[in-house]
UniProtKB/Swiss-Prot annotation:
It is an enzyme of class 5 (isomerase). This is 2,3-bisphosphoglycerate-dependent phosphoglycerate mutase. Homodimer. GO terms for biological process: gluconeogenesis; glycolytic process. The record marks 181 as: Transition state stabilizer. Its EC number is 5.4.2.11. Pathway: Carbohydrate degradation; glycolysis; pyruvate from D-glyceraldehyde 3-phosphate: step 3/5. The gene is gpmA. Substrate binds at residues 7-14, 20-21, 59, 86-89, 97, 113-114, 182-183. The active site is at residues 8, 86. It catalyses: (2R)-2-phosphoglycerate = (2R)-3-phosphoglycerate. Keywords: Gluconeogenesis, Glycolysis, Isomerase.
Length: 227
């Protein structure tokens, strides 16, 4: 069976080189075109889906809608869940990546961005931009809402959604599309493929490119490739 991952199209803060994380930003025109191209590619290759999973962030939701519209499948059920959100970049969210490197040093910022288990500084829960003050997360216990994450923590909060929602859907015979974010998809790919802690640091998923993961009937990994 096949599982298709798509990272959201190029966003406004991708263009501005800002740390985004859980901040809710829109797609650029380039991002819209990437999503359209992904949908057309899926249509041309004959990919049909029974259900789509995405995050609760606008850039992923819009990408999902565009992909499904272009592939003539906008009618299928979509499940939105915060566990597919991007990695939370803590107090770095909204900061310019280059300026942050100049302030803290390239090595420190590289550790924050690429270390598997070291998180950036926490975002104050009282900050106006904190998820604690966003009503889309109102039903999540406050001690579960992250203030900063590394990739390890991103996997730990995404994995229950894989086990409770995505995997059962696939095992029941449903054809699944997941439209999410660079780090939430990397985390799930790490689990599915069996990528080591060291190797995952160099595993990148470009925006708007359908990534196909071939699995056997027990969801064991076989191979992966881009369309």
């Amino acid at each position: 069976m096949e599982l298709v991952f798509i990272r959201h199209g190029f966003s406004e803060w991708n263009a501005k080189n800002l740390f985004t994380g859980w901040r809710d930003v829109n797609l650029t025109e380039r991002g819209v075109e990437e999503a359209k191209a992904a949908g057309k590619k899926l249509l041309d290759k004959g990919y049909e889906f029974d259900i789509a999973f995405t995050s609760v962030l606008t850039r992923a939701i819009k990408t999902c809608n565009i992909v499904l519209e272009e592939s003539h499948q906008l009618w299928i059920p979509q499940v939105k869940n915060w566990r597919l959100n991007e990695r939370h970049y803590g107090a770095l969210q909204g900061l310019d990546k280059k300026a942050t490197a100049e302030q803290y040093g390239d090595e420190q910022v590289h550790i924050w961005r690429r270390s598997y288990d070291i998180s950036p500084p926490d975002l104050d829960p009282q900050d106006p931009n904190s998820a604690h003050n966003d009503r889309r997360y109102a039903n999540i216990p406050s001690d579960v809402v992250p203030n900063a994450e590394n990739l390890k923590l991103t996997l730990e909060r995404a994995l229950p959604f894989w086990e409770d929602q995505i995997a059962p859907a696939m095992l029941s015979g449903k054809r699944v599309l997941v439209v999410a974010h660079g780090n939430s998809l990397r985390a799930l790919a790490k689990h599915i493929i069996g990528i080591s802690d060291a190797e995952i640091m160099d595993f990148e998923i470009p925006t708007g490119q359908p990534l196909v993961l071939k699995l056997d009937d027990k969801l064991n990994y076989v191979e992966h490739y881009y369309l």
